[in-house]
């Protein structure tokens, strides 16, 4: 019985491996638009796809980021300034992309731009921070996608949305997790609604990686500032000892982030270039072998595993 199941499982993975190795033809004629290319995953993906021969259209927040990217890539790569929180910026970028791609349409749209404001417990964070994060990480994804969707549909192309393992299992960073759960839901709906148009939608769910968003020094400074601005009655509820212990816990986690960004960008590239892309990509060993399996456990068991090492607030019962 077990041998039979093992053989079936082996055949399944062999078939999946074979299907996923099939590459889309004429990649050199495909246009891919990527948001958030100033640094991090977006910057690396832009350079990676440029080396592969694709026609990369890179959305950057700053002219400095755009210039640095152009200096590191071939003449094929083009840049545009894009602020995903501004409707007029998205509209202008869409018109620019339309002119670039012509009648071919847009093969790939990668929604990568994001911010990371997860520097404390949920009630420490100001409501403005929740709004700002959702405006970039969720509303920005939705608005860019809806604006460029006709171009993607014309090419029967791909949409790749960068979520997070915190969009699969929420245990830290209420602000960020809320935005990424929204990206997951939006992507699932898009995938089902667009299947009849030949458009494929994938999500990439990275674990912990070292980028500008997870730089410990900057993270620590913001975290201390947030704690300083937290109302006194809330600070009394948790206590300074709790904050110090929580601060050290965050330090351990962020300093252990993976530096191999290719684990993420390779997933993005596969979603854009494979004939049979996956629906979800869990990027990083922590995501694949800890957080994703954890997400399938009973909630009470997952809660225990995740929080057993957390410090206790001063007024805990």
Curated annotation (Swiss-Prot):
Keywords: Endoplasmic reticulum, Glycoprotein, Lipid metabolism, Membrane, Microsome, NAD, Oxidoreductase, Signal, Steroid metabolism. SUPFAM superfamilies: NAD(P)-binding Rossmann-fold domains. Its main location: membrane. CDD domains: type2_17beta_HSD-like_SDR_c. Substrate binds at residue 164. The keyword Transport does not apply. Its EC number is 1.1.1.105, 1.1.1.209, 1.1.1.239, 1.1.1.53. NAD(+) binds at residues 33-57. It is a peripheral membrane protein. The keyword Lipid metabolism applies. One of its GO terms (cellular component) is intracellular membrane-bounded organelle. GO terms for molecular function: 5-alpha-androstane-3-beta,17-beta-diol dehydrogenase (NADP+) activity; all-trans-retinol dehydrogenase (NAD+) activity; androstan-3-alpha,17-beta-diol dehydrogenase (NAD+) activity; androsterone dehydrogenase [NAD(P)+] activity; estradiol 17-beta-dehydrogenase [NAD(P)+] activity; testosterone 17-beta-dehydrogenase (NADP+) activity; testosterone dehydrogenase (NAD+) activity. Pfam families: adh_short. The active site is at 176 (proton acceptor). It catalyses: all-trans-retinol--[retinol-binding protein] + NAD(+) = all-trans-retinal--[retinol-binding protein] + NADH + H(+); all-trans-retinol + NAD(+) = all-trans-retinal + NADH + H(+); androsterone + NAD(+) = 5alpha-androstan-3,17-dione + NADH + H(+); testosterone + NAD(+) = androst-4-ene-3,17-dione + NADH + H(+). InterPro entries: NAD(P)-bd_dom_sf, Sc_DH/Rdtase_CS, SDR_fam. Glycans are attached at residues 71, 161. Transmembrane segments: none annotated. Residues 1-17 form the signal peptide. It is an enzyme of class 1 (oxidoreductase). It is found in: Microsome membrane; Endoplasmic reticulum membrane. NAD-dependent oxidoreductase with broad substrate specificity that shows both oxidative and reductive activity (in vitro). Has 17-beta-hydroxysteroid dehydrogenase activity towards various steroids (in vitro). Converts 5-alpha-androstan-3-alpha,17-beta-diol to androsterone and estradiol to estrone (in vitro). Has 3-alpha-hydroxysteroid dehydrogenase activity towards androsterone (in vitro). Has retinol dehydrogenase activity towards all-trans-retinol (in vitro). Can convert androsterone to epi-androsterone. Belongs to the short-chain dehydrogenases/reductases (SDR) family. This is 17-beta-hydroxysteroid dehydrogenase type 6. It comes from Bos taurus (Bovine).
């Amino acid at each position: 019985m077990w041998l039979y199941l093992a053989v079936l499982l082996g055949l399944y993975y062999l078939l999946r491996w074979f299907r996923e190795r099939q590459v889309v033809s004429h990649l050199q004629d495909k246009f891919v638009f990527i948001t958030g290319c100033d640094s991090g995953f977006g910057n690396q993906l832009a350079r990676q796809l440029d080396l592969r021969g694709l026609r990369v259209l890179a959305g950057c927040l700053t002219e400095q980021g755009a210039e640095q990217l152009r200096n590191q890539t071939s003449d094929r790569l083009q840049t545009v300034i894009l602020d995903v929180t501004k409707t007029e910026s998205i509209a202008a970028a869409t018109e620019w992309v339309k002119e670039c791609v012509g009648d071919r349409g847009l093969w790939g749209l990668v929604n990568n731009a994001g911010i990371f404001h997860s520097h404390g417990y949920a009630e420490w964070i100001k409501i403005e921070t929740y709004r700002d994060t959702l405006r970039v990480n969720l509303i920005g994804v939705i608005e860019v996608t809806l604006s460029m969707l006709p171009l993607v549909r014309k090419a029967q192309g791909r949409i790749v949305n960068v979520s997070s393992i915190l969009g699969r299992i929420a245990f830290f960073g209420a602000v960020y997790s809320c935005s990424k759960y929204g990206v997951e839901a939006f992507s699932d709906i898009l995938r089902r609604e667009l299947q009849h148009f030949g458009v494929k939608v994938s999500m990439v769910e990275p674990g912990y990686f070292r980028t500008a968003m997870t730089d410990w020094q900057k993270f620590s400074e913001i975290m201390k500032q947030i704690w300083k601005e937290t109302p006194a009655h809330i600070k009394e509820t948790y206590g300074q000892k709790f904050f110090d212990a929580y601060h050290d816990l965050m330090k351990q986690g962020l300093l252990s982030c993976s530096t191999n960004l290719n684990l993420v960008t390779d997933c993005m590239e596969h979603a854009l270039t494979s004939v049979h892309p996956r629906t979800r990509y869990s990027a990083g060993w922590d995501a694949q072998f800890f957080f994703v399996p954890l997400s399938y456990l009973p909630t009470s068991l997952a809660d225990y595993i995740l929080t057993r090492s957390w410090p206790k607030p001063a007024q805990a019962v």
